[in-house]
Amino acid sequence: MLKMIKNKDFYVLLLGRLITNFGDSLYAIASTLLVYKMSGSTIYSGLTLFLTSSTAIVQLLLSPILDKINMKKFLILSQFFQAILILIIPFLYKFGKLNVYHIMVIMPIISLINQLVYPGQISLLPKILSEKELVTGNSLMTMAYQGSNAIFDTFAGVIISLCGFMTAFFADSISFILTGILFCFLSKKLSYFQKREEKSKENLIKNHFKSLKDGLNLFKDSRIFALVFGIVFINFSATSISAVLPAFAKNEIFYSLMLAGMGAGLLLGSLFAGFPKLKEISLGKLYIYGMMIVALAWILFSNFQNNIKVGVVLYGLGWFVVGVVNVYAQTMVQIIVPNEKIGSAMGAMVGISTFMAPLGALLGGYLGEYFSSSKAIFIGSFIIFLVAIFWALNKNIRKLPSVNEFNKVLEKIN
């Protein structure tokens, strides 16, 4: 691990991810709560989440581009562009022009850019790390991308409570600027990319969709299809729950602590993924029983609106399994997919797994408005329980071996 940290490119990517995540925590909490505060409706919260989560579908179409652009240049420019974009919110606020629709437009744009940034960073790992270092590298990047939110979300809630929403947006802009400067120190070799040989627009479009098809081909195997099918509805449910969290929480501190609980669960899951004993457990059992635990934890969570401590623990417990699965899913794709197609594959995997999330946001907003946030969380959790039942009845999932036997499964798939 020390050797990896001394790798300049990996260190820059890791540190850049951490700095950006701090700013993102401030922005995500501030903008989500501001939308709910200005509108007073979970319909608007759900609609905003619908718009931001819809960018994952756009990522599915744009993912082949990741293999054909100057990734270093893209990472740098994307950070500076977001730094400017985020300042529009406090600027409009200063002149009394800010309304909920401005935030609902800016949030999806930033979300779309970030949907491409993280897969882009992940696609660079095979170019700077050996195959033996990939699992550890992915684990560290996952911790930086998701696990660090446990700390940053807590700080964000405190900062917003003490300093206000606009301070959060200024701090976020500064974090983007710092990360953009940091990415300037990436090696020049990471600027190289596949140059298009085709000259005509028709061939460029044809080539783009061929690359997209190559990324989607990964999911033709019936075992992977059953797994991804379940994940689609898990994301649908999780997003419906996220849409009503501002109403469920009632204040900045509780909301930020719930997001921190989610981050802590993902962090512990990422760390736990490397434990030898866990690698010996059948993935089928891990997925089925894991989702049952998630569903039951969140059903209980829906009844603890007035108990912050218990609520945060139960909500965080539900995200623990996700942290475990993320590490192995990314590593699997990186090993079986050629380096020149890794960007397409990573983008396709994330895009497909979040396909139903936007509709989940709309459903959550509707249920929260016309019933209650607690009932919306209960319904979302019950859908996850149904996914666990579906996997238990699916022999392709039940027969998945342990992680230690995963290479044999990949050989059969290929």
Give the ranges of each region predicted by the language model.
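Juxtamembrane intracellular "pre-TM" segments in multi-pass secondary transporters
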Residues: 1-10, 189-228, 410-414
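Substrate-agnostic recognition of the 12-TM MFS/MFS-like secondary transporter fold
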Residues: 11-28, 51-64, 70-85, 102-160, ...
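Residue-level recognition of membrane-helix boundary sites in multi-pass small-molecule transporters
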Residues: 12, 43-47, 73, 102, ...
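Short amphipathic helix-loop junctions that connect adjacent transmembrane helices
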Residues: 29-42, 243-254
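Short helix-capping/hinge motifs at transmembrane helix termini and TM-loop junctions
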Residues: 40, 52, 63, 93-97, ...
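C-terminal transmembrane bundle of multi-pass solute transporters/carriers
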Residues: 68, 72-74, 78, 83, ...
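Hydrophobic alpha-helical transmembrane segments
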Residues: 100-111, 136-194, 256, 260-264, ...
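A single, central transmembrane helix in multi-pass transporters
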Residues: 163-170, 211-271
